[in-house]
Amino acid sequence: MNIYNNKKTLFFKLKRNSLKEWQQYTRHKFVISLGEGTLQLSCFKDYLLQDYIFLQKFIKILSLSAYQAKTLEDRNRSVDFIIGIKHELSLHASYCKKFNISKSKLLKTKEKKQNKSYTDYVLSIGVKKSNLELFVALSPCIIGYGEIGHNLSKLKNWKKNKYASWIKMYSSKEYQKIANENIKYLDKLFTKNKKSSYKSLVKIFKKASKLEANFWEMCI
């Protein structure tokens, strides 16, 4: 079964109730042209630079999640994510070298307003809301990239694409496992937080999906 279309999961329900925003994100022209291999290299490089900044802030967000965790299991999960993101940051720097982006260039790049708007929003959720709401805000990123990678890997001749390494990374068994674990974790958090308003979760999911789409847009 396609893990992204399991109708029993909270993720699927949120996606179904945010279909317009979700499709604007996962079917954005940046994603489509990346999958076709027609995305301008300058756009992809800009994305890599901004994504490096995003990943650094992601660590701060997950640190907040670890601090707010009510159980050891939840805290350990957040810590595991932090370790994973730190590893991804080192891989990201190596990956950028393939596109002639130096470490100094990564460190000197200024954050664009669309990037800041996204991370500021997720941080505000982390400060004011529960861990469930925080992970709902993070799910378009964590799970969404898995779905995008999965979908692009189904395209014909994707392996000949100049961005094949990016598609391979997010369609890999390792990343698909991460996405699947997060889908299950959302369900677990939701079960433990029955008092949470579903409408509020949908609102957060929609907003985060819009901000993800804006992230693509800033690189076009």
Each PLM stretch: what is its role?
Residues 1-12, 16:
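Basic/polar N-terminal segments that are highly enriched at the extreme N-terminus
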Residues 15-40, 58, 183-192:
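Short alpha-helical hairpin
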Residues 19-24, 39-68, 87, 136-146, ...:
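Alpha-helical bundle segments that constitute or directly flank the non-heme di-iron/ferroxidase center
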Residues 29-42, 58-77, 126-127:
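Helix-loop segments that flank and shape redox-cofactor active sites
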Residues 46-57, 84, 174, 178, ...:
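Short, contiguous, pocket-lining structural segments
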Residues 75-177, 206, 210, 220:
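Active-site-proximal alpha-helical scaffolds that flank and shape metal-associated catalytic sites
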Residues 137, 157-169, 181-201:
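Structured surface interface patches that mediate subunit assembly and partner/cofactor docking
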Residues 188-220:
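Long hydrophobic alpha-helical segments typical of transmembrane helices together
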